[in-house]
Regions:
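Serine-esterase "nucleophile elbow" of acetyl-processing enzymes
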Residues: 1-56
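Alpha-helical cap/lid subdomain in secreted, periplasmic
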Residues: 27, 46-183
Length: 183
């Protein structure tokens, strides 16, 4: 009797960037489970209790937490962030950086400078851990802001934005486990 080959199983965990990702369109070759919830952040990932141990897990969150952070509490946030990511059970975990956003009409880049610093701290804290970090931050930027050609509302991505994420993830999944390609 022929063995039926199962589709690779991926669980996606995070905020609206995950929730709104048309996974079945971008990844029809995979069984994709979407645990994205709009408006959520660190507390959601810390409380995440779905058994995803038989999946490769893709995580992205943080943009909803930005305005609760400052120079005094950012290091504690990074500690909690990394601990939460490491606690999600998986065959392998792929963590996307926190994405840039455009919050001000005056074309300020300050929020994205802060997000860039936060991403660097998270990435450093993950060194030596069994997490593949997908840094697409610069690919989403134009002149220090989220590229307007990649967003529907200065925060959420459009099809072009999701194509960048999908390409980065697809290329990474084509590599042997625990090895991320240059994005």
């Amino acid at each position: 009797m022929d063995k039926i080959e199962e589709k690779p199983k991926l669980a996606f965990v995070g905020n609206s960037h995950i929730a709104f990702w048309a996974l079945n369109i971008y990844f029809p070759q995979w069984e994709c489970l979407n645990y994205g919830v709009p408006g959520e952040g660190l507390a959601y990932v810390e409380a995440f209790d779905v058994d995803t141990s038989d999946c490769r897990v893709v995580i992205q969150f943080g943009s909803n937490d930005i305005y609760q952070l400052n120079d005094e509490n950012v290091d504690g946030y990074v500690e909690r962030y990394v601990k939460a990511v490491l606690a999600v059970p998986s065959r392998q975990t792929y963590l996307f950086c926190i994405f840039p956003r455009n919050d001000y009409d005056d074309y300020s880049t300050s929020v994205n400078k802060f997000i860039c610093m936060l991403n660097q701290k998270i990435h450093r804290k993950l060194e030596g851990k069994d997490i593949i970090y997908l840094d697409v931050f610069d690919r989403l930027l134009q002149d220090g802001r989220l590229n307007p050609e990649l967003t529907i509302d200065d925060l959420h991505l459009n099809g072009k934005g999701y194509s960048i994420l999908s390409e980065a993830l697809r290329r990474t999944l084509e590599q042997p486990l625990k090895q991320a390609p240059d994005l």
